[in-house]
C-alpha cells in the first residue's frame, strides 16, 4: 500500500491541521486509489477510488464500524443516536425511525417548508445586506423543529440554535486542536470545552422537556417525535426517553445543517455564475410563473435540481466519512488491518477530473440522465451510501429545491465585495465567516 511521506512522529499533522480540505484534495490527486497517511504516530487510509469506496460503504460494510475517535466526540453530543451507534442497536433504531421518513410522510411537510420560507422572506428588504448562511440556518432550524416537535416558541428554537452553534464549534477540524486532543487523549482548550459541555447539558434539558410534553398528547400530535414515541420494534419494545433524546438531537443536526449549508453554498455559487442564475430563473418563470412550488412541480424543475446537485458536488455539507476496520479486510487487493481508520472524502472525490470534466467549475447542466448513468456510483455520494445512507436524504432534497425555487423567484443575491469566504470543515462544512449578500429584487 502506498504511504504519504511526512515528518518523523508528526507525520502529516501540520499540512492536515493547517488546511484539511486542500490536503485531502492534493492527496487524492497524487494517490487515485488509496494511501496510508501518518499523523502523530498513528494514521488512517484515505480511499479515493469510487469502486473502493463502494466496497467500504456497501460490499464490505459489515467489516467496518464508525471511526472510534470521531464516535467518542459524537457520542458525547448525540448519545447513542443513529449518527454515533453501530451494530444491532443501530439497526433497531433505524427500523424504528424509518417509517417517519417514508416518501408519503415526507411529502406532507411541503406546506411546512413553504410556510417557514415565506415567513423568512417577509422580513427581508431589497437593498439590505444579510448573512445568508445565518438566514438559512434559522429557517431550516424552524422547519425541522416544527416537523420534529410540532409548533414551538421562537425563543426555544433560538436557544436550540445557539446550543448547536457552540457544539459544532467544538468539532472544527481547521487548526490542530482536535487532532492533538485525539492523539493525546485530553482536552487542550479548556474554556471552549466548558462552553461546549454547558451547551450539551442545556440542549439535553430542552429536548427532555419537549419529550415529556409530547408523551402527554402523543395520540393527538402529528410530528416526527410522536411517531418515534409510538414506534414499536418487532418484539413490541419502544424507545426509552434517553433514546428519544439522542435521536431527536441527531435529527436536529442532520435535519437542518445539510439543507441550510447546501442552500448557503448554492447562493454563493449562483452569485459567482450569472449564466447559471439566469437559466435557473428562466426555468422557475416557465414552470411556476411566480407562484410557490407544489410537490407536483418537482419533476418539472430539472435545472433547479441540477443546481442543487452541482452545489453539493463542489461544496458538500458532509465533506468526509470515517470508518474503522472491524477485522482484517481486503479492499481491491489492498490489505487493511483490523483497527485501521479509513477516511472517504466527498470534497476530494467530487472534484476528481477522471469523472468530472472541468471539475472546479460550477456547471449544473452536466447532470444529464446520460451523465448520471455513466458516472461511477461513488464518484458522487453527498449523503453517504450503503446501509448507513442518510435517512433524511429525500426530505433534504425536497426541502432544498422548494426553498431555492421560492427565494430565487423573489430575490437576486449579490455577493458583498471584500469578505473572506472560507469553508470550515467541522462535522459539516460551514462558511467560517458567514456569507454576506446584498438583496436585489428578482428581475
Question: Model-derived features: where do they sit?
Answer:
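Conserved cytochrome P450 K-helix E-x-x-R motif and the immediately C-terminal K′/meander segment
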Residues: 12-32, 205, 209, 291-332
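Cytochrome P450 catalytic-core helices
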Residues: 258-283, 394-409
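Cytochrome P450 heme-thiolate monooxygenase catalytic core
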Residues: 1-4, 24, 65-71, 89, ...
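Cytochrome P450 proximal C-terminal region
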Residues: 28, 117, 134, 165-166, ...
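Conserved, non-catalytic sequence blocks in retroelement Pol enzymes and Pol-derived host proteins
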Residues: 103, 215-219, 295-302, 390-392
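N-terminal membrane-proximal hinge/A-helix region immediately C-terminal to the signal-anchor transmembrane segment
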Residues: 1-92, 107, 111-119, 139, ...
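Conserved cytochrome P450 K-helix/beta-meander segment immediately N-terminal to the heme-binding cysteine loop
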Residues: 344-371
Amino acid at each position: 500500500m502506498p504511504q504519504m511521506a511526512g515528518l518523523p512522529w508528526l507525520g502529516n499533522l501540520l499540512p492536515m491541521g493547517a488546511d484539511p480540505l486542500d490536503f485531502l484534495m492534493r492527496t487524492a490527486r497524487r494517490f487515485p486509489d488509496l494511501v496510508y497517511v501518518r499523523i502523530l504516530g498513528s494514521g488512517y487510509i484515505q480511499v479515493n477510488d469510487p469502486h473502493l469506496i463502494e466496497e467500504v460503504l456497501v460490499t464490505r460494510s459489515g467489516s467496518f464500524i464508525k471511526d472510534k475517535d470521531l464516535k467518542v466526540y459524537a457520542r458525547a453530543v448525540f448519545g447513542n443516536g443513529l449518527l454515533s451507534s453501530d451494530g444491532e442497536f443501530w439497526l433497531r433504531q433505524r427500523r424504528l425511525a424509518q417509517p417517519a421518513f417514508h416518501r408519503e410522510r415526507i411529502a406532507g411537510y411541503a406546506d411546512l417548508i413553504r410556510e417557514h420560507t415565506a415567513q423568512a422572506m417577509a422580513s427581508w428588504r431589497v437593498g439590505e445586506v444579510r448573512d445568508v448562511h445565518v438566514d438559512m440556518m434559522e429557517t431550516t432550524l424552524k422547519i425541522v423543529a416544527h416537523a420534529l416537535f410540532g409548533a414551538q416558541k421562537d425563543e426555544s428554537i433560538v436557544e436550540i440554535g445557539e446550543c448547536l452553534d457552540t457544539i459544532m464549534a467544538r468539532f472544527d477540524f481547521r487548526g490542530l486542536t482536535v487532532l492533538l486532543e485525539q492523539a493525546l487523549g485530553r482536552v487542550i482548550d479548556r474554556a471552549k470545552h466548558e462552553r461546549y459541555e454547558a451547551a450539551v447539558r442545556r440542549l439535553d434539558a430542552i429536548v427532555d422537556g419537549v419529550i415529556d410534553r409530547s408523551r402527554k398528547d402523543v395520540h393527538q400530535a402529528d410530528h416526527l417525535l410522536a411517531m418515534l414515541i409510538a414506534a414499536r420494534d418487532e418484539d413490541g419494545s419502544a424507545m426509552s426517553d434517553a433514546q428519544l433524546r439522542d435521536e431527536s438531537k441527531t435529527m436536529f443536526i442532520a435535519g437542518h445543517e445539510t439543507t441550510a449549508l447546501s442552500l448557503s453554498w448554492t447562493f454563493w455559487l449562483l452569485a459567482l455564475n450569472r449564466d447559471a442564475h439566469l437559466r435557473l430563473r428562466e426555468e422557475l418563470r416557465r414552470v411556476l410563473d411566480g407562484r410557490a412550488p407544489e410537490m407536483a412541480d418537482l419533476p418539472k424543475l430539472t435545472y433547479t435540481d441540477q443546481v442543487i446537485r452541482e452545489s453539493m458536488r463542489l461544496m458538500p455539507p458532509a465533506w468526509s466519512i470515517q470508518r474503522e476496520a472491524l477485522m482484517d479486510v481486503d479492499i481491491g487487493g489492498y490489505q487493511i488491518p483490523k483497527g485501521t481508520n479509513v477516511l472517504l472524502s466527498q470534497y476530494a472525490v467530487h472534484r476528481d477530473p477522471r469523472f468530472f470534466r472541468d471539475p472546479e467549475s460550477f456547471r449544473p447542466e452536466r447532470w444529464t440522465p446520460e451523465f448520471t448513468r455513466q458516472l461511477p456510483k461513488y464518484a458522487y455520494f453527498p449523503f453517504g451510501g450503503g446501509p448507513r445512507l442518510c435517512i433524511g436524504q429525500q426530505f433534504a432534497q425536497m426541502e432544498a429545491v422548494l426553498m431555492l425555487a421560492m427565494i430565487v423567484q423573489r430575490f437576486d443575491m449579490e455577493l458583498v465585495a471584500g469578505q473572506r469566504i472560507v469553508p470550515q470543515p467541522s462535522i459539516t462544512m460551514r462558511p467560517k465567516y458567514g456569507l454576506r449578500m446584498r438583496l436585489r429584487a428578482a428581475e
